């Protein structure tokens, strides 16, 4: 099957924003106008195509990143009339599902950042913006909900500049705001666009309304100055007072958008069907194709040499698995982005992370949760594979004769955990397998057994995250379970460097056990995790035993020395040791490594850490004092406050342990008129009094 759309006419985009900015509604309108839908679904009716999980329909929020493909030929611009393929990923706005945004942005070439014209830049807008900056994703901004009372396009543009440190450049300004929002002025063509009907497919081009002409001229000059700053030829023409053509503006705007020096800003009301087609034109005009993004770099799995893959069909196949999902009809689905080459259904691929070769059973083009079998998938495309059993999120799949490992994805560790118990024997039999499947899909969901109580603990990014997963256990896997109260996922670390000898000797007749290691443990910067350095010289420990020492240390780190919590941000150097020709074994050195680490950690000033959350509360004026007092009583540190969209906002850093049940308390404190958002910020040392009570709990557990 030949390629239907040239690679330079492919756009892989994400739709990203704060919760309730209108992402899913906007995607529904895109699918309607591009011919993928014949009837539009509404989020508030639970009928949105992209929200296909039961939990999403009930809550009216997007939890997983649904993927779909559509085609669009722009009405205006340098690409007018040329058919383009757009692969869209609709991402969640709730902070508990931040991993879905992270893994989507890793494989996208561009994004539409949605902002609510009333709320402006909200906390999750900042989070997804930082994630997009991390991957250098070009963006256009779409100010949605212009029909809402209190909508203010220019305030939103100002907030993008100030709160996101971005360079927003409006290429449209609205004609009317709130109930009288009627259309926009196109600053490139200097024409007005007035929508006739609510279906948005009919509009009239008009001269710019008289009362907007001065404002339109001012904003056009602003746009011309912005594009002139990034192109010397254009700057010369602008300074000489020469005319700058529409085509020249678009070419330079595209270049500046691709290097993220300019964010073009558009406006609309997706719910009222206004603005979506022009936003699609902008996606094609300004966002990157795989050709613009260029080659990806990886390394050879054995030699570690740099390997470059160009985005061409003729190159060897290389792709990145960015999402695992369980489909009730076809089983395990692996979503992947093709960076180079072509992949045919039925062919074999190598997973360079596990070293295993696997067969691709089927290749599917996904449309939300519907699927369409295709023969093959080309460079630059996004698709789903059936038949890959051992592939995890972030793994590279490639041509077995041309191996490459692409950059892995790094996910945050869970900050909250709950105990879960099956209700019946039948539930007990299914629980382990079901939890394993959920953990396979979601890298921020972890399952472990409490060594002391024998309970199964599940950990995630927030209360809603775990609530959704427990609900999925019941609906998808038919497992009934009771859950305990949420618990904070505390951590432990050390504050000073220490050297220690770990020795394991056992002589009981016959072959004994012997392993001796000298370890240096020292603290790492926050967030660095764990580092093991082999500094052994002169063969005092045979090479085959070194990995066993590392394994023993990592095993010991799971159960900290202060209160039994996992340890982090530690560097361990193995610098000396001894072995016995007959009695030494991998097991002996693993135990010696564990003993050595535990002994060193106890002397290295170990401390307990707790997750600190970044909290923003938006409240009416009259409750501001109560809200601030309450946050302070929760050991919160107020970092800033201000006014936005007619309400007060407070930013604070608060320990997670003090935030359980906060939504209920905030509702009663403000008569339901305030709301808040919360995301993980960092780990900090626990105050002495709390550390002592946690240690006492551990001691009482051990003596029971």
UniProtKB/Swiss-Prot annotation:
GTP binds at residues 17-24, 90-94, 144-147. Its main location: cytoplasm. It is found in: Cytoplasm. The keyword Ligase does not apply. GO terms for biological process: ribosome disassembly. Keywords: Cytoplasm, Elongation factor, GTP-binding, Nucleotide-binding, Protein biosynthesis. Residues 8-291 form the tr-type G domain. One of its GO terms (cellular component) is cytoplasm. Catalyzes the GTP-dependent ribosomal translocation step during translation elongation. During this step, the ribosome changes from the pre-translocational (PRE) to the post-translocational (POST) state as the newly formed A-site-bound peptidyl-tRNA and P-site-bound deacylated tRNA move to the P and E sites, respectively. Catalyzes the coordinated movement of the two tRNA molecules, the mRNA and conformational changes in the ribosome. Belongs to the TRAFAC class translation factor GTPase superfamily. Classic translation factor GTPase family. EF-G/EF-2 subfamily. This is Elongation factor G. The lineage of its organism: Bacteria, Pseudomonadati, Chlorobiota, Chlorobiia, Chlorobiales.
């Amino acid at each position: 099957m030949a390629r239907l759309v040239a690679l330079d006419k492919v756009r892989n985009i994400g739709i990203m924003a704060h919760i309730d900015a209108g992402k899913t509604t906007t995607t529904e309108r895109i699918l309607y106008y591009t011919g993928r839908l014949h009837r539009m679904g509404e989020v508030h009716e639970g009928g949105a195509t992209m929200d296909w999980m039961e939990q999403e329909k009930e809550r009216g929020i997007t939890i997983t990143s649904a993927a779909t493909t559509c085609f669009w030929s722009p009405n205006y611009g340098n690409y007018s009339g040329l058919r383009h393929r757009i692969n869209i990923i609709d991402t969640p706005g709730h902070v508990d599902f931040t991993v879905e945004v992270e893994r989507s942005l890793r494989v996208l070439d561009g994004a539409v950042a949605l902002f609510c014209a009333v709320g402006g830049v909200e906390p999750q807008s900042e989070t997804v913006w930082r994630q997009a900056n991390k991957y250098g994703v070009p963006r256009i901004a779409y100010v949605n909900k212009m029909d809402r009372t209190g909508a203010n396009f220019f305030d939103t543009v100002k907030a993008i500049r100030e709160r996101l440190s971005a360079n927003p450049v409006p290429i449209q300004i609205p004609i009317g705001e709130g109930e009288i929002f009627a259309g926009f002025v196109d600053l490139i063509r200097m024409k007005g666009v007035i929508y006739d009907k609510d279906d948005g497919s009919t509009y009239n081009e008009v001269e710019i309304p008289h009362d907007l002409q001065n404002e339109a001229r001012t904003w056009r000059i602003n746009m011309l100055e912005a594009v002139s700053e990034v192109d010397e030829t254009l700057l010369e023409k602008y300074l000489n007072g020469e005319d700058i053509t529409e085509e020249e503006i678009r070419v330079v705007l595209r270049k500046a958008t691709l290097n993220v020096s300019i964010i073009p800003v558009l406006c609309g009301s997706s719910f009222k069907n206004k603005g979506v087609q022009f936003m699609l034109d902008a996606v094609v005009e300004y966002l990157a194709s795989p050709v613009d993004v260029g080659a990806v770099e990886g390394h050879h799995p054995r030699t570690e040499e740099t390997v470059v893959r160009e985005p061409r069909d003729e190159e060897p196949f290389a792709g990145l698995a960015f999402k695992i999902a369980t489909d009730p009809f076809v089983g395990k689905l692996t979503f992947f982005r093709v960076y180079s080459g072509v992949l045919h259904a039925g062919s074999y691929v190598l997973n360079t992370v596990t070293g295993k070769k696997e067969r691709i059973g089927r290749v599917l083009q996904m449309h939300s949760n519907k699927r369409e079998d295709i023969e093959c998938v080309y460079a630059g495309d996004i698709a789903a594979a059936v038949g890959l059993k051992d592939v995890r999120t972030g793994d590279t799949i490639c041509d077995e004769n041309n191996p490459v490992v692409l950059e892995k994805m790094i996910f945050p560790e869970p900050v909250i955990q709950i105990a879960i118990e099956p209700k019946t024997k039948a539930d007990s039999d299914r629980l382990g397998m079901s939890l394993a499947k959920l953990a396979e899909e979601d890298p921020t969901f972890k399952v472990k057994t409490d060594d002391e109580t024998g309970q199964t603990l599940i950990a995630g990014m927030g209360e809603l995250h775990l609530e959704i997963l427990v609900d999925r256990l019941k609906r998808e896997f038919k497992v009934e379970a009771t859950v305990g109260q949420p618990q904070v996922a505390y951590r432990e670390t050390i504050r000073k460097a220490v050297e220690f000898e770990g020795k394991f000797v056992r002589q009981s007749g016959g072959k004994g056990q012997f392993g001796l290691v000298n370890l240096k443990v020292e603290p790492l910067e926050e967030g660095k995790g764990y580092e093991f350095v082999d500094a052994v010289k002169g063969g005092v420990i045979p090479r085959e035993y070194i990995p066993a020492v590392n394994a023993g240390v990592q095993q010991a780190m799971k159960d900290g020395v202060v209160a039994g919590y996992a340890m982090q941000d530690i560097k361990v150097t193995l610098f000396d040791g001894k072995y016995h020709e007959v009695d030494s074994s991998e097991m002996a050195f693993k135990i010696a490594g564990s003993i050595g680490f535990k002994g060193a950690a106890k002397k290295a000033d170990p401390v307990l850490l707790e997750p600190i959350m970044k909290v923003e509360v938006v409240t009416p004026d009259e409750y501001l004092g109560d809200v601030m007092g309450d946050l302070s009583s929760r050991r919160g540190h107020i970092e800033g406050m201000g006014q936005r969209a007619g309400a007060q906002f407070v930013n604070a850093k608060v320990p997670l342990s003090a935030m359980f049940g906060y939504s209920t308390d905030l509702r009663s404190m403000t008569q339901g008129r305030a709301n808040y958002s919360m995301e993980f910020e960092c780990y900090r040392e626990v105050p002495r009094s709390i550390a002592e009570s946690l240690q006492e709990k551990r001691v009482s557990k051990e003596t029971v």
